[in-house]
Amino acid sequence: MNTIIRLVLILTVFSNLAYSSSIELTSPNKIGNTTIKTQRFGGSTTIITEDEIKTSGAQSLGDLLKQVPGLSVKQTGGRGGLISIFSRGNESDHNLVIIDGVKQNDVGGSFNFEYLSINNIESIEVLRGPMAGFFGSSALGSVIIINTKRPSDKTEISLMNSFGFNQSFKKDTVGQTDGGIFFVNEQAISVSGPLNKDSNDINIGYILSYERIDDDGYRIFNDAFNNKVLNAGINIVALDDKLKIQTMVSDRWATVRYPTSSSGGVGAYSSVSGTQRDWRHLNSRSINTSYEIYENSSLGFDFSYFFNKRVTRDSGSGNVDWWEKKKTYNYYYEIENYNNDLITLDAKIGYEYLDETSNYHANASSFATDYGHNTYIDSIYSMISLNFNDSAFADIGIRKDDHEYHGSKYNPTVFLSRYMSSELKLRGGYSRGIKYPGIYETYSATSLDPEESESYEIGMDYENTLYALSLTLFKSKTDNMIAYRSSGSPSYRNLDEARSKGIEVSGLFKLQNELSIKYWLTYLETKAVNVNNTVQQNSYNYANWQDDEALLRRPKTSGGLIISKRHNNLYVSADASYTGGRWDYQNSSTRLYNESFWDFGLYGDYLFSSDDLYQSKVFIQVSNLFNDKREEILNFTSPGRTAMIGFRYDTSK
């Protein structure tokens, strides 16, 4: 209650600061299905556009997210291996991932970003910090919103084809690599446009896209990765633009193979009993409808469905099959751009119901019935965005989540920003987040409390025609963290607590002759706290939790830069990223220091044909340019150099 009172007082003072000289801003887009408008938001947000994706030289979503300050991105081995993201010191299962409006985290909160191809993405929105007031449960460390290409009002065709090779390191002491070359190729096609271009009563647009990746890996043993993605969508606008319906469907099939023993260890050939295979089928569907009942106000209904089937096979006894289904129903009333002489208001109130089911397949193993569950979370929420004379802004959200077994939680979120001039914005805020226990954790511990986080931040953004700078200072804490302990009962308990603070910096220099430098830097301090009982100090996972010691896999310093140059039809960029030293674990009770490393990449394209109707270019991209051997995660050697050459064609008419 004291926190709420303080926030109300801050907001009251803040509203009085709004001055009358209006600053002309471009029309900002909304973030996700909220009232937040990008350019006016007081929180830490990074938007990655389609053009930035195409010219980044990135092979995966993980490569793109490494450029976001505050995120520590780590990958286990080669392409297809698990990509974990630690946002501002939080755990890797504290990131809420939303794709085309569908929440897509695995049971327990984890998400492998490697299963997403980047060829059909229109934009990526990254909100750092807890955001439960706007997005609900699981939004502890960050919210990552991925928008694939949408139906368009004119015919558009996009084609991409590329091929190349992975070059492994010279033969090492455990025989995982031999300096060989392994083939990789990718293709993508997208077609969108109107279905009834000349109709005045109803407008229908469509999109259909397909992508595939075939990567033979980088080691002697088979560690190949295959990925296929099919997306489709339809937009309908009718009744004088009052009725809007959008539906999206996505099917993804991914297989990754990696040489491990049945216990998961990677070692010399003699110790590897076989190649493990992880197969996924992910299907998501969504329909979003809204109807304008009065001017600037509408009723809406969203439905989303997510299915995740996983099969893991190896030559040992570790075969596992499981599936998960999520259905979300969201009903809301929304007001947009309601204004008087002083304030412009956007507001939304709603009710959301999430039904979640998962189970092991009946014939999978002796664990066939251990983890089956069917549970729900129902939520009521409200959010409001206030615009004071186009100079000061407030985004406020509050949400009550009620879990069938783990209780109710209220979570407020407040962010404020003010433009001191057309170039300088000051911002800051307070936010909370929760994550309810996953089914694995609750099998023998039904009384667990949700994990909770709380964060404060303050920052500034400055931009003119020559350079841009963004600076954020933050401080956060996470409580009731759920940990596994091999001794005692139940196995999972609310034991761990953590604190973090840091500075995030990013910016851009625009030099002469279309030369630019983009940069980002993160300084992060983390520590475990209140580790003062024998359960934690003498049990499994103690390596990760030592009192007043840094958390694992979170470097204190990290950053990078991209230098790009355009000359006539030629575009070239070179990137360098730095990951500082960090602690990792050798086993459940022993931690080791993992050394820092640099990663270099190169991208170039040549526009050989372009007019008002189409554009064609060839491109080349190289990752791990100098074929440096490193370990992003201890005991997992990262892949060597990858070089790709390709062709891209885009047309519109």
Feature map (PLM): residue ranges:
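Conserved C-terminal beta-signal and adjacent last beta-strands/turns
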Residues: 192-198, 202-204, 211, 235-239, ...
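Gram-negative outer-membrane beta-barrel transporters
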Residues: 160, 387-394, 475-477, 495-586, ...
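Extracytoplasmic beta-strand/coil segments of soluble accessory domains associated
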Residues: 23-26, 62, 66-103
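Membrane-embedded beta-barrel scaffold of Gram-negative outer-membrane proteins
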Residues: 295-312, 358, 419, 426-427, ...
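Short acidic/polar hinge/loop motifs at secondary-structure boundaries
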Residues: 102-130, 187
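Structural signature of Gram-negative outer-membrane beta-barrels, strongest in the C-terminal barrel
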Residues: 246-250, 289-294, 342-346, 352-356, ...
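Transmembrane beta-barrel wall of Gram-negative outer-membrane proteins
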Residues: 178-257, 276-299, 339-341
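Short, acidic, small-residue-rich periplasmic hinge/interaction motif at the N-terminus
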Residues: 20-54, 62, 92
